[in-house]
Amino acid sequence: MEIDINGDPGTGNHFDDVHIRQVGNYSPNAKQAIFNTIHQDKAESRLACWFRKLNDEFEKDNKLKKKFDDIRRYKTKLPHTIGLDQKLKDGGFSEKAIEQARRLKQYFAKKSTKFQYYESAQRIDSYLFAKVCSSFDTYVMPLIEQATPLTDIKRAVYEQVILPIMNELNENGAADACLCYNEDDIFGMLYYLTGNCHINWTDYDV
């Protein structure tokens, strides 16, 4: 059995141009050779692994007695918290938009509470909380500090925070039969973090 390597990255090719094939019936006297292409399976992501484990934990009702510190810090209100309604009002949200945000926050909190003592659910929520906060601080907060119109800020929230997270969930959540988060849930997560003072919609340093 021999390995046949085609391509040479040193002659202008990319490493993607190099193909490794297993010769199935190599013989000096053979008139033809049968090649079997070797495929390397993509490693499972942490997120996909947690979704898969959550199904098993839920089926076996394998719960923890307490929450991890990583998730508790996001679910704990920070000092001097002024609440979701006031945060959004300060950010220029209408009463109708605030009511919708409050509703989405409650829907998310209800779903999250159902799975709050499953280890993998805590890890998933903690991971997503961190993604929401990081993306918001990176792409949205600078717009808020520049007094960008609210319509543009909301567009940035959707394009830079909600959509990337949904894409990651769609790519890694095929095994998810428990949380099944959708866009409303991620918005609810955003407003949940707002209510706990991890997200601001105006620059309070001004």
State what each model feature region is.
Residues 46-206:
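Long, low-complexity, intrinsically disordered terminal regions
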Residues 1-45:
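Long, low-complexity intrinsically disordered regions enriched in small/polar
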